[in-house]
UniProtKB/Swiss-Prot annotation:
Domain notes: The cysteine framework is XII (C-C-C-C-CC-C-C).
Molecular-function GO terms, alphabetical: ion channel regulator activity; toxin activity
Taxonomic lineage of the native organism: Eukaryota, Metazoa, Spiralia, Lophotrochozoa, Mollusca
Location of 6'-bromotryptophan modifications: W36, W37, W43
Keywords assigned: Bromination, Disulfide bond, Hydroxylation, Ion channel impairing toxin, Neurotoxin, Secreted, Toxin
4-hydroxyproline PTM sites in chain numbering: P23, P39
Free-text function comment from the UniProt entry: Mu-conotoxins block voltage-gated sodium channels. This toxin reversibly blocks voltage-gated sodium channel in cephalopods, with no alteration in the voltage dependence of sodium conductance or on the kinetics of inactivation.
Main localization, broad class: secreted
Domain of life: Eukaryota
SS bonds (residue pairs): C3-C16, C11-C28, C18-C33, C27-C38
Tissue distribution: Expressed by the venom duct.
Name of the protein in question: Mu-conotoxin-like Cal 12.1.3b
Any Gene Ontology CC annotation: extracellular region
Subcellular location: Secreted
Length: 44
């Protein structure tokens, strides 16, 4: 998922946080950032 400011900067469906410098790209969680998708996300 891409990050969505309408859900407090989290990625839709998975609760990861947006990287501030790339609010429409990277998603972050405790494992770090990846491009477009959050680690462990299978369906989004």
């Amino acid at each position: 998922d891409v990050c969505d400011s309408l859900v407090d900067g989290r990625c839709i469906h998975n609760g990861c946080f947006c990287e501030e410098s790339k609010p429409n790209g990277n998603c972050c969680d405790s494992g770090g950032c990846v491009w477009w998708w959050c680690p462990g996300t299978k369906w989004d």
